[in-house]
Amino acid sequence: MAHKKAGGSTNNGRDSESKRLGVKRFGGESVLAGNIIVRQRGTKFHAGTNVGLGKDHTLFALTDGKVKFEVKGPKNRKFVTIEAA
């Protein structure tokens, strides 16, 4: 009788769905209050003036204006601020 040996099993074959993280509004772009600026895990970018921080570390605009990225402080942290238009 013709036989074929059974194939082995594997623990691979899955992948998680991408989370679409990253900068959503870049420096110089106009934003409205409530617009999401950055989606991130942890505080790669910190909230500056007129920017709110969500519970998942999402940065969002608190007022209308232009987005500005800057490096400040002794630890050279990246801050996102909104300058009033």
UniProtKB/Swiss-Prot annotation:
Keyword set for this entry? Ribonucleoprotein, Ribosomal protein
One GO CC term of this entry?
A: cytosolic large ribosomal subunit
Q: Which PROSITE patterns match?
A: RIBOSOMAL_L27 (PS00831)
Which GO biological process entries does UniProt record here?
translation
- Keyword Transferase in the entry? The reply is no
Q: Which GO terms describe its molecular function?
A: structural constituent of ribosome
Q: Annotated region Disordered: where?
A: 1-22
Source domain of life: Bacteria
Q: Mind telling me which NCBIfam families this protein's record contains?
A: L27 (TIGR00062)
**Would you identify the family this protein belongs to, as annotated?**
Belongs to the bacterial ribosomal protein bL27 family.
Which HAMAP family does the entry mention?
Answer: Ribosomal_bL27
Q: What is this protein called?
A: Large ribosomal subunit protein bL27
